[in-house]
Structures are given as structure tokens and as C-alpha cells.
């Protein structure tokens, strides 16, 4: 009996030893090389090890069972992988780590027109991928930009909900918007074209805040937004994304990739948006949100050529029908004075492409063209506009020793015509230009960039825009950059300022408007902090300064019934500091935090005034956490804005002269437990904020939008408040106690209340 027990004990020990003898080993790599000192842990146990100089690791004496292995290394994303040990055979398992610089090492092209890693570029470029925009799904690029620090979509009309993009407090026309590096969205389409760009076409968005005129021309005064569309070669075979909201907005994105022979790959994208619900929660008998139906079709082709030379061409067509106004409005009232409505039909076509010439030297021919037709009625005011823009550019890219040269010639043709009295005949403008840029490597840690552009405007003559940039890399984790340049901008009021179109105020242009000129500079600092447990913190801070001469300002205050445009008799300044902080934890928690402090002012005759609709402070955030065991991702996003100065119509106007502090916050949950599918749902505007709060009304005189009952003073009229009303101004009467006219310009944010949304994505790769 004792012998039997002894044999059983020896057998058990032998079996236990066999179990403990199993090992897991392999190599840890990243960015094409083996990683030394990476931490490898067997979760749920005390076993851990560190890779050697060859990136090799080995975990010994692992028993049979199911485990999770976690691998962490400074500068790389933490990876966790399931592994099962079914028998006593040793297991070989390699790991490939991804860079964890939170897109600091993304390849960008917007800063210098060359593909370069963000950290190696002398020009600061911010990059936002589709992952960022999926945190708060929207139907257009315009809405998607609301969670980017220092970038604010600004609504310009409380009825038709048109808007533009402000960068660091500068109005939309100071921002150049590109698609694949081509100037597609500009002038007339800054007002209506932005809402027609579907998110489904976007690979990433690059943003340059500050001077970029030496490469992109005079319009890039305040910065640029470059929308990089998807590469057909890397796109999924088929994708679909549909979401709807409790407001009954519906958005559908479809994408399909197909090959034509062995030489061509094509990506076809379709976007359809529809919102046809008349909602009036603020009870002013006007629509809270513009009704809209929009379809956009996009087709991009990549062609394979010898020596990997580039040839890509893309086209997009868009049609939109939008209206807002009196809740009783129908199409039969369009342009009439019975029921007020603002109705805009937009048709737009675009063509862009790049072709690398078949020479040993790197010569790239880029081209773009667009046509934009707009047929609008703002009550009885008719605005019918037609714009055509063509652009052609040839660049030469050459490295000579320490010099990385880029030279180019470009020509831009603009045609514009409308039916307003301010446009007596169609305007045609040629803008040929030549530019050269030299990026000089002074040492492994420092480089300098010198650039100069010369354009000749067929109306305003010669335009010089120099540029200077310096980059110093103290070490792998600390980088300083300084940029400076000038800008020059020709203003077209009726294509840039929606308030000039509506007819709710008379437009007065006091003198021949001179082109605006600017000088600007910014200082950029990047600090990366890596922790041994895999946590990463990235800090990027930028101080910026822009001074304008000949700045054109819109005066809403001198006469409440007019918008008076004139060059400022002085100067204007936009300055501030902006900080972004990215934090990645190995647990799956990720934070993106940003804040910007602004000081914008117009200085005229020694008097400094803050412009309308310009905040002093803004902050954004995105907090994401993924629960791996549930395949569930949570995204909490939001922004906050400080008060802005708002235009009032009279001294008796009861609306607040400033907006309050306000915040728009959203939450989303995404489930990805099914192959190729994602389900997402959430709530937008959690705090239920609308501009109507704390105001008696937003749009003035909605009961009399054609001003039929407004009394204009002859200079002797006495209002109900006992004061003589100056000639030409509105008399305060019992029917109009505040002395107002119909006006839609008192707007600074979206008028949608809290709402839910639900969506489904399908991706076939």
C-alpha cells in the first residue's frame, strides 16, 4: 500500500513538472526593428520578463490553461493578446508593436508640400484621423471640426444655418480649405460648400494654424485645413455607415472599391443626407434647424505606373436643397412676401488630380477645377451666383546635399458673377505665381526653412509672401519650432459674408476696399513623456500672433439697419496661446485635452474694440475607454466657449449683448463584437444648451419678417420711450417697442436641443 502511494506521488510530481516546463518565447519588434527592454507579462500570474538586446523574451514554467500576454515598451502602444496552452509543447509567439506617439509621427504633406513625419517637419501640422471623428459622428466636415482645439464652426444665419470655420478666432475667409492639397473650397463655397463634404471620403485632416501663404497663396492668411481623401488602394472593398437622430436626421455613407485591369483602382463614394422635419421648440414660429436634402457622389482613381510614379484623379458632384424660415413656408412662397423663407439650391462639381511627369527629376503636375451654382431667395431678396475656379501647378522636388528644395509655378483663374447691384459685370481674375522653398539641415538637431512666393493679381498687381521657419530638436522628446510669414487677401463680401446677402440689413460700402495685409508668427513646443508602464503623455503648445493692416470690418453698431464695410483706420491683432495634451494609458483609457486663450482686437483711432463673435477662451476634450471583454468603446466629447460679443439692433434690444459661457457635450457607445459590423448610439448636447436660453428671442421680428409694419424716422419722430429717433432709424412704437427690424444675425451656436442618435457601420476588407 505504501509503495502504491509513493508511486502515485512520484507520478503527480512528474506530471506537475511536465506542466511547469512549458515555455512561451519569441521576439518583440516595432518600426522594423527588434525592441530591447520591452516588458512582457503573463496577466493573472506573477510571471514577467524583459526582452534582451535582440528583442527576445521567454516566459518559463507556464502551466496548461488560457492566458493573456501584455507587452509594453516606451514609445509604443501596449498590446494584449490571448494565448492558450493545450499541451506541454513550447509555444513561439512574436509581437509587433505600433508607434504610440499619438500621431506625432504621422506622415503629413500640408506643411511643406512634401511627405514628412510630423516631428521632422519645420512647420507644425495637426493630424486628425477618421478614428477621431468617429467619436462624435456627424453628417459633414463642417460639424466634425467642432471638437478640434482652436477651430470653431461658426453659424452665420439663424434661419438657413450657413457657416464658416474660425481658426484661432479669425473669420472663415482667412482659412484656406483644400482637398488633397488643391484649393477646392474657397470664396462662394465657404458659405455653403463646407456642409457638402461627407466624412466617408476622408482619410485624415491636416491643419496648419498660422502662415502658409508662401506655398498656398495669399488666401492662407490664418491657416489651412487640408482634407486628405481616401486612397483607393487602401480603402475597404465595401463600406456602409448609416445613422439617424431623434430629430429624424438621416445620413448614409456608401463606399466601394474595384479594380479595372491590373493598372487602375477606383473608389466610389456616395453620401445622402435628409432632414425634413419642421421643429420649433423655441416657439417663434420659425424653424429651429434648417431643413435639407443633399446628395454627394465622389469617384477617385489611382493608376499604377512604372517606377511607382503617381497618377491620381478624382471628381465630386453635389446637390443640395435647403430651406428655413416660417414654419408655414412651402415652395410656392419662394421669393414672395407672403410667407418668409430662405431657400438655397446649390449645385457643385469638382475635379482634382496629380500626375508625376515621366522624368528622372521629380516633377509633379497638379490640377483642380470647380463650378459652383447657387440659386437663393432670402425672403424677397434674390441672390443667384455662378463661380468657376481653375488651378494648375507644377512643382520640382530636389535634394542637393543639405538642401531640400521645392520650387513651383502656379496659375489660378477665378470667374464670378451674381445678380446683385454690387456686381455690375462678371469678374475674371488671373493669379499666376511662382514659389521656391529651401529646407536646410544645419545639423542633425536643427533645420531652417526659407520660402518666397510671388503672385500677380490681374486687378491688384504684385503680391510677395515670404516665409521663415526654424526647427530645433533638443532630444527625441523635446522639439521647438518657430514660423513667420505674411499674407495678402482680396475680399468679396457677397461670397464671404452671409449677412450681406439676406436683405435684413442694407449693405453700405464706404470706400473702395483695399486688400488686407498681414504679418504673422508662431512659436511651437512639443514635449513627449514616456513611462515604463506604457503610459504616454504628449504636450504641444503654440503661441501665435497676427497683425493686420487694411483689415475690412463689418460695422453693425453705427446704424442698426445697415452693415457698413470699410478698411480699418488702424490695425487689428489676433494673438494667443494654445495647448493640446494627449494621454494614453495601457489600460485602454485615452484623453485628448485642448485649450486656447485668445486676444483679438481692432484698434482704430487709438480705440481698441473686440470683434463680434470672437471668444476669449475655448477648450475641447475627448475621453475614450475601451472595455475589451465586452467589445465596447465609450467616447465622451465636448467643448466649452467663453462669452462672445453679439450684434444688437437698438439700445432697447432686450437680447443679451454677450453670449453666456456654454458647453456642448456628447457621449457615445460603440459595440464591435460582430465581425465587420459596428453598432453605435449616444446622446448629443447632454446639457441641452441652445442660444435661446436666457433670451426672449433669437431672430427679431419674426412676426413681421418683411418689415411691413416697421416705421422709419424722418428725423422728427418721437418713440414710445420719449426720445427723438434719428433720421433713417427705426421708431419704437407700441407694435415695435424695442425699435427692431427683422434680423437673423444674432446667432453663435446650433439651435438643436438634446437628442439621441443610433448608427450601424459595415466594413468589408
Language model features with spans:
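C-terminal beta-signal and adjacent terminal beta-strands/loops
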Residues: 640-647, 671-765
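Short, acidic, small-residue-rich periplasmic hinge/interaction motif at the N-terminus
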Residues: 27-33, 37-43, 72-76, 86, ...
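Flexible loop and strand-edge segments within Gram-negative outer membrane beta-barrel domains
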Residues: 275-296, 304-363, 369-388
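Membrane-embedded beta-barrel scaffold of Gram-negative outer-membrane proteins
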Residues: 263, 364-376, 473, 481, ...
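Extracytoplasmic beta-strand/coil segments of soluble accessory domains associated
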Residues: 142-183, 203
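Short acidic/polar hinge/loop motifs at secondary-structure boundaries
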Residues: 60-61, 166, 182-209, 297, ...
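N-terminal periplasmic accessory domains that precede
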Residues: 91-95, 141-144, 161-166, 193-198, ...
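Gram-negative outer-membrane beta-barrel transporters
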Residues: 441-445, 538-539, 543-547, 567-648, ...
